[in-house]
Amino acid sequence: MSYESKKVTVAEEGSVVTVTPRSGQIATKDIEVTLGLSPKSLEVYNTKSGTNYKSMPEGSYSFDQKTVVIKKGELVAPTVKVSIDPLTKEMLDSGDKFALPVAITAVSGGQQTLEGADVMIYIMDQVIITSAPVLTGTKPITMEMRQDYTVTQWSLEMRINMSELGDGVTPGVGYPGPPSYQNQAIFSAGPGNGIAEDGEIYIRFGDGPIPGNILQIKTQGTQVNAATKFKNNQWYHLAFVCDGVKLTIYVNGNIDATLDLPRKPLRLVKNSFGICNGDWMVTDAIVSEVRFWTTAISQSQIQNNMFAINPGTDGLEAYWKLNEGSGTEFKDATGHGNKATAPNGVVRWVDGIRSDGK
């Protein structure tokens, strides 16, 4: 049994969905239909889809009517409007995802409903409005992690918006050909001994013959380029997932490139982590939602949690929302105490960043 789902964008003023109960055949008499919520159906949906949606709390939604009638000789009942309030700050801060499992809970006259077709799971897609710092090579973020790491599986996520990405392959602006803006590193961490094969996560735009608008990751002595040609001043969600055998790059939740790995542990020392901390990083980068995992996350996890996630999720080692709006210190939402600071300050803060891109 599976249930249909539908995503609902919930803006600052809330949202309204409509439900129209219908019969599979012309009603031979009046049929009274009652609507409500089915938490059990949401549990089944979560199990089958690998999600962990919480039911919207009581008082955060309302039906304009719960009982409607399919008249004799008709197929459908009057439409029911369900009003949904915006998610509260507490709900947003939790990182949990919410849904409204609307179901036909009763039908008069012993009429039967088609199991699975009597439920609709409305997935709440709350518009998140946040702030984020602008970084560059002279104003990076450096981390002091709580420990060193030796891992066979890991994942890294971030949202990023680059102000300038070259489309040439020359060393710099002063050389013939279009600007390349090579080796613009947006994240790095390493083993501390300078031997890349022992560890290293090095993510950059541009590499010699690789144009500056192409993303590349180096790890364990090998590297792979993304297929996407990135654009200036556009938000992207990036995820890099290592399952111990293969590295996968996701761009906006979609698989972009893969790389076979040498199947050995990755070593990273705690003071080697940094964002936009390379000398070649000369343009501005707005960065948000940086997460480091000690497990390989799934594509559905990536797609369902681009703008927020529960900080207590298993395997989430560090989570910097970078939404403070001011200052040079950034909180690790997991509570693990992984420190992130901008020792030279940030270029500026950008406010009013919306998850719906408006």
What are these regions (language model features)?
Residues 43-68, 219-220:
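Short beta-strand and strand-turn-strand segments in soluble, beta-rich domains
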Residues 88-99:
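Short glycine/proline/serine/threonine-rich loop/turn segments at secondary-structure transition edges
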Residues 118-135, 307-358:
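Extracytoplasmic low-complexity segments
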Residues 125-132, 200-262, 348-358:
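Extracellular glycan-interaction surfaces
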Residues 128-212, 297, 301:
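Extracellular glycan-recognition modules
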Residues 144-156, 227-234, 280-286, 310-313:
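Extracellular/lumenal carbohydrate-interaction signature centered on repeated Trp-anchored short motifs
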Residues 153-164, 281-305, 317-326:
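Extracellular, beta-strand-rich glycan-interacting domains
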Residues 258-286, 311-315:
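Flexible glycan-contacting loops in extracellular carbohydrate-active proteins
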